C-alpha cells in the first residue's frame, strides 16, 4: 500500500456521483488506502494521482471531469445519459471493481460484460442522470408523493448543516468519507445481487428457453426468478413474443401464467380464456375437462393446477381456445 497515492475531488458541497467514484477507486489495489484530497486549486489537483469531478479535463487516465462544455460522453452508443464522475470511473474501471468486490467470482468474459452493463444500467446510470439534472419522467407530471430517501438525497444528508459551527475542510472531508462509504455499501450490494443471484437466474432462464425450442409454452422446472429475464433473452435470440404461457411450481402446486406484453405491463400476450376466469376447483375442472384445476384469476393472467401435467394441459387448451 502506497500512502502517498492521492485521489482528488472538489472541495465544498459533495454529491453522490463523486462519492461513488472515489469509493470505486479505493477498491482497486493501486488506490487502496489512498489519501482523499478535496480542493479546487489546479496545482493541488495536478499533484494528485487521479482527479475526479473537478479540474475541467477528461483523458481517461488521470483526469475524470465531466463538467466541460464539450463533454457529451455516454456509457456506450446505446445510452443517451451523459456520464457523471461515477459513470466515468465505472466505464473505465468497472470490470476491475467488480473483480475487486467479488474476488472469488468465477465468470467468463461474456457474463462479465453482461454484469458490467447491468450494474451500470441498474445502479450507476441513475446517478449520472441525477447529477446532470435529467429526470426519469417527462416534465409536467405531478408526482404523487415525495420520495425523500434516494441515494443522492442520502448523500446530501451527510453535508454539515448550514447553521453548524463546523464548516472547515476537515469536517467536510470526514462527512464526505461517510457519504462515500454509504454509496459503496449500496454499490457492493448491487454488484453482489446481480453477480450472485440475477446472473445465475438468467443462465437458467436461457437454458429453459432454449429447451423449449419453438414452443409457445415455457416450462420452468425449478424455482428461480425468471420473469425479468424472459423479454431480454427473447430479444437476444430474435424470438420476441414467442412465449404465451409459463408453467412453474409454487412449492405446493403448479401455476400457468400468461406472459405479459412487456416487463412492467399487466396486459398479457394471451390471457387464459375468458370463460375460465374467476372459476375454481371442481367447477373449473368440469368446465375445462382437466382434472386437478385450482383456479383461474379473474383477469386471466394466471391459473393453478394440482399437477404439472394439469397445468401444461391448461396452457395447451388455452392456446387452442377459439375465443383467444
From Swiss-Prot:
It comes from the Eukaryota. InterPro entries: MYG1_exonuclease. One of its GO terms (molecular function) is hydrolase activity. GO terms for cellular component: cytoplasm; cytosol; mitochondrion; nucleus. Belongs to the MYG1 family. This is MYG1 protein C694.04c. It comes from Schizosaccharomyces pombe (strain 972 / ATCC 24843).
